[in-house]
Amino acid sequence: MENRYATSPEDVKRYTTDKLRQEFLVESLFTPGEIQMVYTHFDRTVIGGAIPMKEPLALDAGDFLKTDYFLERREVGIINIGPKGKVIVDGDEYTLNKRDCLYIGLGKRDVSFHSEDSSNPARFYFVSALAHHEYPTKVLPIEEAVPTKLGSDAESNNRTIYKYIHSEGIQSCQLMMGMTLLEPNNMWNTMPAHIHDRRNEVYLYFDMEDDSRVFHFMGQPHETRHLVVKNEQAVISPPWSIHSGVGTANYTFIWAMAGENYTFTDMEFIKMEDLR
């Protein structure tokens, strides 16, 4: 598990491009036959990717978390971004097609990832946060998630938001998780920008062609920077940072948050004239 410490906005505004990427961009989450994880000290969030092949992959704490098992003090949200697979939780099987979500609560000991077809394996993305109470394990197919339409073609941000884990959906301690799909010929997300100083956020960009890129904007509103992001790469967004992007083509991204105020609408919008 890779370890990344929290950062100050005063320090970040002096970072080079390489340093920005080192601190905030997760370039490699998906390796066939392995689980890759990154621990960020922003709200103690763990970001991970798993591609099970012929053998299942077990989610364990390793040496880093200093617990007997991964979910001893945590909860986790999982979304499959690839072909059909399943997750087995303490003996119970949960099938996930592409874009389906599974929430697993505090205290579940044995969690493993499986692909239905090892020649065309599932690609599981997960985000974990600290937990203080056990909520039930629940799967939510994308067909059962309530879509919210936002934006317009004129603004190049016509998109659909699916909220999976939130106060009016799958219940959790603090984790919030969902997905945004942009329509063809629409490239902007989260503009006008916002911040939520009580919660960090992580974006995973996917459904992109190999030669497509997203220019992800970050930093304080008056001190913005950008990261150039490829398919299936994640961005760690500190609580003090905006998180917005524009692509060379349309894309999909998964957003996940942890921290205080378990409310999707708890955010402070930034006026366009205040962005620099």
From Swiss-Prot:
Gene3D superfamilies: Jelly Rolls (2.60.120.10), pectin degrading enzyme 5-keto 4- deoxyuronate isomerase, domain 1 (2.60.120.520)
Enzyme class: isomerase
Keyword Metal-binding: yes
Enzyme Commission (EC) number: 5.3.1.17
Record's cofactor remark: Binds 1 zinc ion per subunit.
Binding site for Zn(2+): 194, 196, 201, 243
Domain of life: Bacteria
Cofactor: Zn(2+)
Matches recorded under HAMAP family: KduI
NCBIfam families: PRK00924.1
Protein name: 4-deoxy-L-threo-5-hexosulose-uronate ketol-isomerase
